[in-house]
Amino acid sequence: MHPLLNTITDPVKLRALDRKLLPQLADELRQFLVESVAKTGGHLSSNLGTVELTIALHYVFNTPYDRLVWDVGHQTYVHKILTGRREGMSKLRMRGGIAGFPRRDESEYDAFGTAHSSTSISAALGMAVASQWEGKKRSVVAVIGDGAMSAGMAFEALNNAGAMDTNLLVILNDNDMSISRPVGALNNYLARLMSGQFYATARRAGEKMLGVVPHVLELAKRAEEHVKGMVTPSTLFEEFGFNYIGPIDGHDLDVLVSTLNNIRNLRGPQFLHVVTRKGAGYKAAEDDPILYHGVTRFNPDAGIIPKASVKPSYTQVFGDWLCDMAALDQRLVGITPAMREGSGMVRFSHEYADRYFDVGIAEQHAVTFAAGLACDGLKPVVAIYSTFLQRAYDQLIHDVAIQNLPVVFAIDRAGLVGADGPTHAGSFDLTYLRCIPNITVMAPSDENECRQMLYTAFQMNTPAAVRYPRGSGSGVAQQKEMQMLPLGRGEIRREGAEIALLAFGSMLQPCLEAAEELNATVANMRFVKPLDDDLVASLAANHELLVTVEENTVMGGAGSAVLESLSARGRTVPVLQLGLPDTFLDQGDPSQMLSECGLDREGIVHAIRARFPK
């Protein structure tokens, strides 16, 4: 089915191909991509959009000696297929299989591990400087999407790279602009001209000659910008010190290969603007690239058929609460850093468009923007993944907590996230949040508790965070009426003897199951900060062993808070802390991962009996 692709086991074989065969290879790769991802799930539309670009990069550059750094990295499936990992696609994002993102420990072709956005230019610049320092004639390429370019870190790197005049190629993979007007014969011709050696040599010679007459040099540069500006979108990147080339058609292999061949011989920082289409070559993904961005298994002939979930996800619980709360309070505004669908804000964005703010991939800005809104009387709710809130930690402390501003953080994907692996796991939020003064930290055990905690957080006039896991809850009915929970108060969910399980958030259900076998007391702690110190003291006074259970690293997490509470009151009861280990956990099925961490019923029982063998 894929006769040409079957012959490509590495980029050396690719570079030996006749250039005329590359379009056929692209067609076969697309067919294989759709067939493969339909069986495993994964990111589809972004990978379909970068087929030709990936082929051209490996065809022109001498990888892995030449470095390719992919921003975010979810668009690297073709890169993995062409670099000897095609067979591994059958276990994509599964335990023991290849990762959905570049990993240095997976292949020498993965020059830099990525998964969060906007890091590629900084990393590539570091590699370029290191190569220059070592006297190596190595090309270094960073491929970054238009969404990732909205983050400040990308512009910080551009600013640094332009000033250093290092040999570096930045490729903007722009899949958000129309391909019809800016990309055409004239534009492609200009791109080849500007990337050619004659143009580059003439440009540098002219700069040297005119450098003795600064005013004339400035006039010449303005004339050049004027000519470029007639057919290119901006001279912004020229102002950063880059030689801007493009935009060009990212699905025209002849143009891509010719342009890249020219660029690899140029000196100094180069910026190539490539326009692509998400989902290219698979009509269903082209028609709805958002639906096909991240997919579960599906029939490629029929396409994705949405199924109604029996149990609402925590993300859906948040989205419904947000709309309900917005109807009750005109001050509520919702903020997301480019995660509208993932954070459950689609309905809110339609029903309350004037109160909805998608700030782009800019977590730091999102948090400080929320702080500014709160300063002047609005009630901002920031919907953000746990792993991405890490990127705005200083803003969380400096701009929100120190000023004690009423910002609500709805923290999705807390705990393990399965197939996306360690880069997306929310393993640390309880640890990094509970040490910040002024903030309240809550962890719901079910859907209704999540709804009530969000309401509680919104009613407070101080910073508050509600962290909840990915996926569905236990199916508990949600109360339409919302009510404040007693601040810093947990509850006893099961009375037992000798052993007390202190469950935080998602760990309540496995604790209740384990308690049946152990005849243990179970407390639903609800609040990590302020901790229910009285409940902890009472449990310590009436039990021989306390067991804290959390879907967060045990290092500095909720269990540590319990130990601190006991120490402050002079209690010496034994405490067993169960949680995520001090390591980065590989991708896999979430239930399997929890089992391996000892956070299911069997694991909890086993750990307690090993510690308390009565």
Swiss-Prot record:
Annotated binding of thiamine diphosphate, by residue: H74, A115, H116, S117, G147, A148, N175, Y282, E363
Gene Ontology terms describing biological process: 1-deoxy-D-xylulose 5-phosphate biosynthetic process; isopentenyl diphosphate biosynthetic process, methylerythritol 4-phosphate pathway; terpenoid biosynthetic process; thiamine biosynthetic process
CDD domains, A to Z: TPP_DXS, TPP_PYR_DXS_TK_like
Domain of life: Bacteria
A GO molecular-function annotation: magnesium ion binding
Family annotation (Gene3D superfamilies): 3.40.50.920, 3.40.50.970
UniProt entry tagged with the keyword Ubl conjugation: no
Keyword terms: Isoprene biosynthesis, Magnesium, Metal-binding, Thiamine biosynthesis, Thiamine pyrophosphate, Transferase
The protein's enzyme class: transferase
SUPFAM superfamilies: Thiamin diphosphate-binding fold (THDP-binding), TK C-terminal domain-like
InterPro entries: Dxylulose-5-P_synthase, THDP-binding, Transketo_C/PFOR_II, Transketolase-like_Pyr-bd, Transketolase_BS, Transketolase_C, Transketolase_CS
Pfam name, any one: Transket_pyr
Binding-site residues for Mg(2+), renumbered to this chain: D146, N175
Pathway: Metabolic intermediate biosynthesis; 1-deoxy-D-xylulose 5-phosphate biosynthesis; 1-deoxy-D-xylulose 5-phosphate from D-glyceraldehyde 3-phosphate and pyruvate: step 1/1
Cofactor: Mg(2+); thiamine diphosphate
Metal-binding recorded as keyword: yes
UniProt catalytic activity: D-glyceraldehyde 3-phosphate + pyruvate + H(+) = 1-deoxy-D-xylulose 5-phosphate + CO2
Cofactor remark from the record: Binds 1 Mg(2+) ion per subunit. Binds 1 thiamine pyrophosphate per subunit.
Purpose of the protein: Catalyzes the acyloin condensation reaction between C atoms 2 and 3 of pyruvate and glyceraldehyde 3-phosphate to yield 1-deoxy-D-xylulose-5-phosphate (DXP).
Annotated family: Belongs to the transketolase family. DXPS subfamily.
Subunit description: Homodimer.
Name of the featured protein: 1-deoxy-D-xylulose-5-phosphate synthase
